[in-house]
Amino acid sequence: MSAAAAGRGERLNHAGNPGHRSKYSRVLLKLGGEMFGGGQVGLDLDVVAQVARQIAEVVRGGVQVAVVIGGGNFFRGAQLQQRGMERTRSDYMGMLGTVMNSLALQDFLEKEGIATRVQTAITMGQVAEPYLPLRAVRHLEKGRVVIFGAGMGLPYFSTDTTAAQRALEIGADVVLMAKAVDGVFVEDPRVNPEAELLTAISHREVIDRGLRVADATAFSLCMDNGMPILVFNLLTNGNIARAVAGEKIGTLVTT
């Protein structure tokens, strides 16, 4: 845990009572857009509601939560490029998809009674705040969830890289990378159900072995700055709280 996190100490929940003890005080949660669609194009509102309930649980326990969501349930820039679209334009379409996901999650979090702000890297003042890291930190300190939409606002950068960069800029303790699998495997578990799950690994080894968890740029950025990544299964209810508490789930990636 960072020195800043240690200084924050045990936080109070909204009722003024000591929150559950957590390993991390401020986390960046990375959500894949494809999970928001339940494997289809568009939004699966049952999935969004379940994710919102899990996030609300840890926020009530006093943990500061920022979120980055992909847009793969609407558009994936690289795939659109393969179909003949110009890459820059298709990436911007993907960024707009992340904003739609961000607004949906904001709505369900607020239904859970959690104050939530969306900040976007592309200015769209009628629906979200602009991305301002100092303001984002102030929101977090006040117990609000902050969702970062529109990726980096630049083509050719994935939302995985956005998650790493935003985590560093807001002083998060860890990137919680939520997936539809239990963690990092030596092989694709969808191809080989007997593939070995790694409980711990270094950033360098992930990059050198070409393990396809997230893009190499995101892992390199975290490696260079000592940012741990916990890869875990979002589809198991309660796993966000388990991850924040430091329970042994998923795969912990460290320098």
From Swiss-Prot:
It is an enzyme of class 2 (transferase). InterPro entries: AceGlu_kinase-like_sf, Asp/Glu/Uridylate_kinase, Uridylate_kinase, Uridylate_kinase_bac. ATP binds at K30, L31, G32, G33, G72, R76, F185, D188. One of its GO terms (cellular component) is cytoplasm. Pathway: Pyrimidine metabolism; CTP biosynthesis via de novo pathway; UDP from UMP (UMPK route): step 1/1. Residues 1-21 are annotated as: Disordered. GO terms for biological process: 'de novo' CTP biosynthetic process; UDP biosynthetic process. UMP binds at G71, D91, M152, G153, L154, P155, Y156, F157, S158, T159. Inhibited by UTP. Keywords: ATP-binding, Cytoplasm, Kinase, Nucleotide-binding, Pyrimidine biosynthesis, Transferase. Its main location: cytoplasm. The keyword Lipid biosynthesis does not apply. It comes from the Bacteria. GO terms for molecular function: ATP binding; UMP kinase activity. Homohexamer. Catalyzes the reversible phosphorylation of UMP to UDP. Belongs to the UMP kinase family. This is Uridylate kinase. The lineage of its organism: Bacteria, Bacillati, Actinomycetota, Actinomycetes, Mycobacteriales.
